[in-house]
């Protein structure tokens, strides 16, 4: 192996690319906050979908 290859291997072992931190303002760092902004507030929930303020079927559960 050439000297350059050995040098690059040592550098990658000492400073792996995964050790680099993301900026604090990137959305990947804050998935919970991003999720809260996407989901609207809902009052009633069914098993898989939500009921809104209109008439709820009996399968809805009150979540307040």
Swiss-Prot record:
One of its GO terms (cellular component) is extracellular region. InterPro entries: Conotoxin. Residues 20-49 form a propeptide. GO terms for molecular function: ion channel inhibitor activity; toxin activity. Keywords: Disulfide bond, Secreted, Signal, Toxin. It comes from the Eukaryota. It is found in: Secreted. The keyword Secreted applies. Expressed by the venom duct. The keyword Signal applies. Residues 1-19 form the signal peptide. Disulfide bonds join 50-64, 51-60, 56-63. The cysteine framework is III (CC-C-C-CC). Belongs to the conotoxin M superfamily. This is Conotoxin reg3.16.
């Amino acid at each position: 192996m050439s000297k350059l290859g050995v040098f690059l291997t040592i550098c990658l072992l000492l400073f792996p690319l995964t050790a680099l931190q993301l900026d604090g303002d990137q959305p990947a760092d804050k998935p919970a906050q991003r999720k809260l902004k996407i989901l609207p507030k809902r009052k009633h929930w069914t098993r898989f979908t939500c009921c809104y303020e209109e008439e709820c079927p009996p399968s809805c559960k009150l979540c307040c």
